[in-house]
């Protein structure tokens, strides 16, 4: 059976299962070249499938990750001919509005500068009394059709947090595990977190812990003037290292973030988050009931008035010491809360779990918090899917159908299979390059030159893991400023990540585990030897690399170590500010031409500027 997984919403994504195994997954932004894109046009799905010698006509089932508890009550409102509300719902992520009861011929509606809605792909649904098919809280079936294709597909709609849970558990090596999902819900009625247990092919949610840290972090990011939380939350994490944690936050974080604090606002998360931010910054007054009600009803005028009244930081103010200190408090509260909540999960599951933890959801892109979870809770092992944000839910919904519904035996995945699950592109039209010489590339790196590195299939998730990377030497601190200002064109305070030979990682960093997907920030043991690869607090978001994982890049780092004595390179995503990571060879060539870098490597060829 061939299963196509789809996620519509910010970080829209596609995933493919063939012969009982996840073989491919990708964020749509890589194809559309629009950051955080939410559109799922048919042409991009076809383009993705073509990379795996598959067509839409070959597909047997389509799965969707969504908020099933929101959709279920609407199932009996429309007749089978007009019952497209559920599919319209998948096209939006920024409001609770019923968009239309006809999708055919509808155009995209621009929500923001980076988000679109109402994909044209879905034409009609066939829904004879769907309510009778809704037998669980986590998924339901309907038949779906795609415009222009004379075929009816089996469709499975899987709860958003269940999709997160499935993405991490079913790709782990664990027979049983506790699962923690956490993100920022766009809908005030929806859960922002979940506690699950996984055993064999089964996943079961046993508690909704009501944690809202993702929403809190996103709101803080926007009101500190950094930008929309869905895009810029990582910048807040970088900025926090320059701040000082206040005694107020240190003394009160547990009380502020306890579930009883949330419940006293009658589960109106926006009021709670306003209150929590006020405790920290004093700049975010509690919004009046009338105004808040208007916001929840999506009244744009009231929303705009509220934004002005709250007086958020300007973008210029976002790097003031006051903003840095607030960012430090936000990060501290997030880290301590996640450790506390994860330990609660351990206590609630220790009677039947052997110490395994799986996590997923955008909140767990917080690499600083992940290190604290890894080292300060009683769990022995921790697994994360590389695409742990919403882009991973396309794969999660497909895996849920495969293992939970079809009861197909679980598969083992290598690190490389999970890291590099995107499309492999044809590069035969690039005929003018020189044969790749890793010794030459290592020499250039050792002389503080910057390399565009493009190799094989694209990465799964938001991190550059060695197939779409800028590579540079970590030896000189000036490299950090050069790459931020002249290559990446981004904020000066953003750090760069090191990639290190796995067997040498403990010589350079305080860690006793591998982090192949660059999802942990760890302390550095030798920060003065690699100043360009550590942050202001001497931490680093490390990627560990084995020869089995990526032999070509591993060999390059070995050669660099022979010349420099350092088994580490800077590894940052092959893009510039505001753009997705490059996808195709042509994308890489275009970026090389407009970037202040010295060498371009595409698979087994290289190009040297001004050679």
Regions found by a protein language model. Give the residues of each.
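Flexible beta->alpha loop and helix N-cap segments adjacent to enzyme active/binding sites
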Residues: 7-28, 32-35, 54, 77, ...
């Amino acid at each position: 059976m061939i299963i196509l997984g789809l996620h519509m919403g910010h970080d829209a994504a596609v995933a493919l299962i063939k012969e009982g195994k996840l073989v491919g997954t990708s964020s749509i932004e890589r194809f559309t070249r629009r950051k955080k894109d939410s559109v799922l046009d048919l042409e991009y799905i076809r383009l993705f499938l073509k990379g795996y010698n598959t067509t839409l006509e070959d597909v047997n089932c389509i799965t969707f990750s969504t908020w099933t508890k929101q959709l279920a009550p609407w199932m009996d409102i429309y007749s089978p001919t007009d019952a497209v509300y559920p599919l319209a719902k998948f096209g939006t992520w920024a409001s609770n509005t019923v968009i239309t009861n006809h999708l055919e011929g509808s155009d995209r509606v621009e929500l923001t500068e980076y988000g679109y809605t109402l994909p044209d792909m879905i034409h009609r649904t066939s829904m004879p009394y769907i309510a009778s098919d809704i037998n669980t809280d986590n998924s339901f079936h309907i038949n779906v059709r795609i415009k222009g294709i004379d075929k009816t597909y089996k469709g499975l709609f899987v709860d958003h947090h269940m999709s997160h849970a499935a993405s991490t558990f079913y790709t782990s090596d664990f027979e049983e595990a506790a699962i923690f999902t956490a993100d920022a819900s766009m809908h005030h009625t929806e859960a922002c977190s979940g506690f699950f247990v996984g055993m064999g092919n089964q996943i079961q949610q046993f508690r909704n812990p009501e944690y809202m840290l993702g929403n809190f972090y996103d709101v803080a990011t926007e009101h500190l003037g950094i930008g929309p939380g869905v895009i810029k939350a990582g910048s807040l994490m970088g900025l926090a290292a320059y701040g000082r944690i206040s005694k107020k936050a240190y003394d009160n974080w547990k009380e502020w973030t306890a579930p009883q604090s949330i419940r006293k606002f009658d589960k109106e998360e926006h009021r709670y988050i306003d209150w929590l931010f006020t405790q920290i910054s004093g700049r975010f007054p509690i919004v009046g009931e009338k105004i808040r009600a208007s916001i929840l009803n999506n009244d744009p005028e009231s929303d705009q008035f509220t934004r002005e009244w709250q007086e958020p930081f300007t973008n210029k103010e976002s790097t003031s010491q006051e903003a840095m200190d607030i960012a430090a408090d936000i990060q501290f509260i997030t880290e301590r809360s996640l450790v506390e909540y994860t330990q609660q999960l351990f206590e609630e599951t220790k009677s039947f779990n052997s110490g395994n933890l799986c996590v997923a959801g955008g909140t767990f892109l917080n690499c600083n918090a992940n290190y604290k979870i890894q080292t300060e809770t009683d769990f022995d092992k921790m697994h994360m899917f590389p695409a742990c944000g919403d882009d991973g839910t396309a794969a999660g919904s497909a895996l849920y159908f495969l293992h939970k519904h079809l009861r197909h035996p679980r598969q083992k995945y290598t690190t490389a299979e999970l890291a590099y699950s995107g499309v492999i592109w044809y590069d035969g039209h690039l005929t003018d390059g020189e044969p790749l010489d890793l010794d030459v590339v290592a020499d250039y790196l050792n002389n503080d030159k910057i390399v565009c590195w493009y190799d094989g299939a694209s990465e799964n998730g938001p991190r550059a893991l060695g197939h779409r990377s800028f590579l540079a030497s970590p030896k000189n601190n000036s490299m950090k400023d050069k790459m931020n200002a002249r290559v990446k064109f981004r904020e000066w305070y953003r750090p760069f990540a090191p990639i290190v030979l796995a067997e040498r990682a403990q010589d350079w960093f305080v860690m006793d585990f591998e982090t192949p997907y660059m999802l942990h920030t760890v302390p550095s043991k030798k920060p003065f030897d690699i100043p360009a690869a550590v942050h202001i607090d001497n931490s680093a978001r490390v990627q560990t690399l084995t020869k089995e994982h990526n032999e070509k890049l591993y060999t390059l780092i070995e050669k660099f170590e022979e010349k420099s004595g350092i088994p580490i390179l800077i590894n940052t995503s092959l893009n510039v500010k505001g753009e997705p990571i490059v996808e195709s060879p042509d994308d890489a060539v275009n970026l090389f031409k407009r970037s202040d870098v010295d060498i371009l490597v595409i698979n087994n060829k290289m190009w040297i500027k001004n050679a």
